[in-house]
């Protein structure tokens, strides 16, 4: 997170951002990229890949994708793969009609919450 924040704030990887990324990659036994990446966009792509691999079972991916603006596209790509029958999901049974819209970036406001707070007159967009 520090590497991502440094990169976003400064528009390019800083020595601190590179050191944070190096620490993660060293722990995993992966080669160091320090000094090889000068573009903020390229550095962010590497951070996205690192977070996907490092935190794959931590239930953070959804929030990362929403923060980066990639959620709807990435989830719809996965739905197509799930329906293709050429992967571990065993074909169309895994996601027969599933398509993600921008509404899925938010959770709906529960009816119980709306019932006790009359100032909540609607719901999140798409719900």
Q: Residue locations for each model-derived region?
A:
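Acidic/polar-rich alpha-helix caps and helix-coil junctions
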Residues: 1-127
């Amino acid at each position: 997170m520090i590497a991502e924040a440094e990169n976003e704030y400064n528009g390019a990887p800083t020595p601190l951002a590179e050191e944070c990324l190096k620490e993660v990659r060293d722990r995993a036994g992966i080669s160091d990229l320090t000094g090889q990446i000068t573009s903020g966009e390229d550095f962010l792509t590497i951070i996205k890949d690192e977070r996907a691999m490092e935190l794959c079972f931590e239930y953070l991916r959804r929030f990362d994708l929403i923060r980066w603006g990639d959620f709807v596209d990435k989830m719809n790509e996965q739905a197509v793969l799930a329906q293709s029958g050429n992967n571990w999901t065993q074909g169309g049974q895994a996601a027969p009609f599933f398509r993600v819209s921008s509404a899925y970036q938010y959770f709906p406001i529960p009816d119980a919450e709306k019932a006790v707070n009359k100032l909540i007159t609607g719901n999140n967009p798409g719900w």
